[in-house]
């Protein structure tokens, strides 16, 4: 089943990625606040084992902190890696250790949704910023949007944050999202006012206005949420 799902995933991906870009899958679920510590313990116990995942795959556990009432999962596991690494991860087959982990996890959680996609343009180091704001887009002209996005952010993005433009491939919601922007921060102060660095910087302000004007008629923001990294293996 894992091999079949990954084959379908790859068949849906038509863009060639740069070496630093990555594929991802997410599994979102709900867990009561009183049981979060137990879930964290189970995840750490399992994913800390050397044979728990393929080489080159990183697993994250996130808390869905700020979200709308339809995007109402509480936590999420995310698997990321290169195409080869993720292909190996989803070709490993079932094993007793994995099944036992899922059984234990199911005692505390209720499944919500799952999705898959890939990054397109990443500025900064993925996986190093614990607070992540995510904007969900419906993009009509993907090539034009990506070009404008890269032009602005590659020049003006502050060095202490990570910016990724990516695309949803599988598990899209009825809202019809096609792309996302992930902004990684080290603290909430910066995350709360992500555009503060432009204040007083006339070049950045001008470039931002030009970027917005260029993409305004081809992009619709559908949703936003903030997730917090609480585990990484």
Located regions from the model:
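Sec-dependent N-terminal signal peptides
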Residues: 3-17
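Short S/T/G/P-rich N-terminal loop/turn motif that feeds into the first structured element of a domain
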Residues: 19-233
């Amino acid at each position: 089943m894992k091999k079949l799902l990954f084959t379908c995933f790859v068949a849906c991906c038509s863009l060639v990625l740069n070496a630093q870009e990555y594929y991802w899958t997410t599994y979102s679920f709900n867990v009561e606040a009183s049981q979060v510590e137990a879930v964290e313990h189970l995840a750490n116990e399992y994913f800390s084992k050397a044979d728990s995942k393929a080489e080159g795959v990183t697993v994250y556990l996130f808390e869905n902190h700020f979200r709308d009432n339809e995007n109402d999962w509480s936590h999420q596991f995310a698997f990321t890696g290169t195409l080869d690494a993720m292909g190996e991860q989803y070709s490993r087959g079932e094993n007793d250790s994995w099944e036992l982990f899922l059984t234990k996890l199911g005692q505390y959680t209720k499944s919500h949704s799952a999705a898959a996609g890939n990054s397109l343009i990443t500025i900064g180091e993925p996986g190093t910023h614990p607070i992540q704001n995510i904007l969900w887009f419906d993009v009509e002209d993907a090539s034009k949007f990506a070009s404008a996005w890269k032009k602005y952010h590659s020049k003006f993005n502050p060095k202490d944050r990570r910016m990724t433009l990516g695309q949803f491939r599988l598990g899209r919601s009825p809202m019809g999202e096609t792309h996302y922007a992930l902004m990684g921060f080290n603290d909430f102060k910066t995350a709360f006012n992500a555009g503060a660095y432009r204040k007083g910087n006339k070049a950045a302000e001008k470039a931002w206005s030009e970027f917005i004007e260029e993409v305004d008629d081809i992009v619709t923001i559908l949703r936003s949420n903030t997730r917090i990294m609480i585990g990484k293996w």
